[in-house]
Amino acid sequence: MKSIAAVVAAGLAFAASATAANAQISDDVVKIGVLTDMSSLYADATGKGSLAAVQMAVADYGGKVKGKPVEVIVADHQNKPDVGLNIARNWYDNDKVDAIFDVPTSSVALPISALTRDKNRININSGGGSSDITGVACSPNTVHWTYDTYSLSNVAGKAMVKRGEDTWFFVTADYAFGMALERDAANVVKEAGDRKSVV
């Protein structure tokens, strides 16, 4: 929970910066949406804990940014990209949310990042881990504050290549994070030389 609180504190500082001033603070209230998983497989790791961390960070920051009060709302994206995207679109278009935080699971995080860019708002992603968030889908409106598949695959992959492993088999989770992890790990192995075999 402390790491989420640190993310929110950094996000609040970001929102107060001149760069973030270009993304409008609407209605004289800084409205933060915690878009998290409250009911699916990431609920225990995020969910209520993420909401509590955001609330603690807002309190620690004094409840204001640039003299404007901070309001926190929360929604459950149910680990479903369409549900998450509909919530985020409604928040930006109707509820005047200025920033979305958390967003566990890459399959939800990627479309939220794209929408955030289109709406010129702020997305502090501490939940999705696909390297595509800061790679092919990179956005100036999204801060990726977590591990990613590039770092995970490079640490483990390079260590195993150095140890002499020469044949690799992947059992891959069939979703955005799993596919990105396999791709990034396979690239590590291929970059190690022709003697390596990826199956």
Model-derived segments and their meaning:
Residues 1-21:
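Gram-negative bacterial Sec-dependent N-terminal signal peptides
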Residues 29, 45-50, 60, 64-136, ...:
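Beta-alpha junction/loop-to-helix N-cap segments that form part of ligand/metal-binding clefts
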Residues 96-196:
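Extracytoplasmic ligand/sensor domains, especially the bilobed periplasmic-binding protein
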Residues 53-62, 182-187:
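Short, well-ordered amphipathic alpha-helices
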Residues 29-47, 104, 166-171:
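Short beta-strand segments enriched in small/hydrophobic residues
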Residues 41-52, 176-180:
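Glycine- and acidic-residue-enriched helix-capping/strand-helix junction motifs
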Residues 20-34, 63-70, 161-166:
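Immediate post-signal peptide segment of exported/extracytoplasmic ligand-binding proteins
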Residues 48-56, 140, 151:
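A general alpha-helical scaffold signature found inside nucleotide-binding enzyme cores
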